[in-house]
């Protein structure tokens, strides 16, 4: 009950993943990120063990193609799994087991993978791929989120009888480039919500503002005001912080 995009940005060198599902707390279940900034997802009948197997293999220096084969050797239920591996260098790879619930499948582009299971149809991942390809001028986080939104608007999750399922959790992670390829520029999670993709959009817009402040605390602590002062000024200006939760009770 999941749709996912893992992608690299050729313009910035960043990489990341966005995922949404009817299950809860997907950000702690499916995605993995190596110290080299490689992106992994283990989903469908999700196995943390398979995700960890791929992660460990890549940390040990195996190629993405070698790493994605490790669960297929050790997991007797591999046909229930869907696996995505997006290395920083090299071809993206994916596997969709024969026993994943329909509609299930994946599409691989030069710098991305879109995949899902228990979907309204192949049109869901096709729309995600089109949204990603058509947004090259935007930052990677925006492109990933647009792809997720396109998947939802194209039917999202649905049972075989056509019953639609809502997305109750979502996750968005963007990793840096170069020497900071393992640094998480965005690491956002919606663990339980009646409309997780919409909530992720709200959270993303707020984090774009708050993230600038967080970067200032990291890089220029001697020039950065306290959070209380920052949020008071942000609330005064309005914008995305208007009517949002703040550190004030």
Q: Language-model segments: which ranges?
A:
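N-terminal nucleophile
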Residues: 1-249
């Amino acid at each position: 009950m999941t749709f996912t995009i893992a992608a690299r940005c050729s313009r910035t060198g960043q990489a990341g993943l966005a995922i949404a599902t009817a299950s809860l707390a997907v950000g702690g279940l499916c995605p993995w990120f190596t110290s080299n900034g490689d992106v992994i997802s283990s989903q469908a009948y999700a196995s943390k063990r398979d995700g960890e197997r791929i992660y460990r293999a890549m940390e040990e220096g195996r190629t993405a193609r070698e790493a994605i084969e490790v669960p297929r050797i050790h997991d007797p239920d591999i046909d229930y799994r869907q696996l995505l591996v997006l290395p920083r260098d090299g071809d993206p790879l994916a596997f969709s087991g024969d026993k994943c619930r329909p509609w299930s499948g994946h599409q691989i582009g030069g710098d991305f993978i879109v995949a899902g299971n228990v979907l309204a149809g192949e049109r869901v991942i096709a729309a995600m791929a089109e949204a990603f390809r058509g947004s090259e001028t935007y930052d990677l986080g925006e492109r990933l989120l647009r792809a997720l939104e396109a998947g939802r608007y194209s039917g999202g999750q649905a049972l075989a009888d056509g019953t639609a399922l809502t997305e109750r959790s979502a996750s968005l992670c963007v990793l840096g480039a170069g020497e900071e390829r393992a640094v998480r520029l965005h690491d956002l999670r919606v663990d339980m919500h009646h409309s997780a993709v919409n909530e992720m959009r709200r959270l993303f817009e707020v984090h774009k503002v708050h993230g600038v402040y967080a970067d200032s605390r990291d890089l220029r602590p001697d020039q950065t005001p306290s959070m209380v002062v920052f949020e008071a000024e942000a609330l005064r200006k309005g914008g995305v912080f208007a009517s949002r939760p703040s550190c004030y009770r």
